[in-house]
Each structure stands twice: as structure tokens, then as C-alpha cells.
């Protein structure tokens, strides 16, 4: 009497699953207006997490620590002591040109 022992084997390799392969979207943080640049009121100067740069004269701080200009003027980045920085906006006197 012939007894056959049939065993079925996998014909595809078992593939493990990886727990990697995803990343968060970049937040586009950083300085948006450089030193000496003319800005309008409401322009964003710096997008940041925490106060890496502190608000100075005529600069406001948003709820997410974004710094923005309160008036039209020129941006100036200054040092506060050894390890702190501040951003200020100074008004610019505009000369009127009279057509002759």
C-alpha cells in the first residue's frame, strides 16, 4: 500500500512590515526679512518655535512666537547681551520729491 505524505509550502516569500517610512511636513521656520530690509506693517519678520529672537521696538509677537512688524520701516537685528537677540523696526523718513 502506497501512502503519500503531501505537504504544501509557501510559494511566496513572507515579507515583514516596516515601522519606518513616514516623516512630518517641514514647517518653513526661520527669518523672513533680513537686516536693513524695508517692511510694511504686518509683515512677518521671523517664524520660530519659542523666542530664539525676542521682539524689540515696533515688533509684535504672535501666539506661535512669530515676530511681525507693527509699523512701516527698516528691520534691524540686535544683540541683547551675550546670547540673546532682538528684532526691531525703525521708521524711515521719506523725502517728498516735488516735480518742478
From Swiss-Prot:
Gene3D superfamilies: 2.40.50.100. InterPro entries: Ribosomal_bL27, Ribosomal_bL27_CS. Keywords: Ribonucleoprotein, Ribosomal protein. The gene is rpmA. It comes from the Bacteria. GO terms for molecular function: structural constituent of ribosome. GO terms for biological process: translation. PANTHER family: LARGE RIBOSOMAL SUBUNIT PROTEIN BL27M (PTHR15893:SF0), RIBOSOMAL PROTEIN L27 (PTHR15893). One of its GO terms (cellular component) is cytosolic large ribosomal subunit. Pfam families: Ribosomal_L27. Residues 1-9 form a propeptide. The N-terminus is cleaved by ribosomal processing cysteine protease Prp. The keyword Thylakoid does not apply. This is Large ribosomal subunit protein bL27. Belongs to the bacterial ribosomal protein bL27 family. HAMAP family: Ribosomal_bL27.
Amino acid at each position: 500500500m502506497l501512502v503519500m505524505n503531501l505537504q504544501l509550502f509557501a510559494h511566496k516569500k513572507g515579507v515583514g512590515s516596516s515601522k519606518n517610512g513616514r516623516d512630518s511636513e517641514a514647517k518653513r521656520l526661520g527669518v523672513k526679512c533680513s537686516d536693513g530690509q524695508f517692511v510694511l506693517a504686518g509683515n512677518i519678520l521671523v517664524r520660530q518655535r519659542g523666542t530664539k529672537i525676542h521682539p524689540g521696538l515696533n515688533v509684535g509677537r504672535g501666539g506661535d512666537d512669530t515676530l511681525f512688524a507693527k509699523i512701516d520701516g527698516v528691520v534691524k537685528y540686535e544683540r541683547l547681551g551675550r546670547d540673546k537677540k532682538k528684532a526691531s523696526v525703525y521708521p524711515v523718513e521719506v523725502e517728498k520729491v516735488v516735480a518742478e
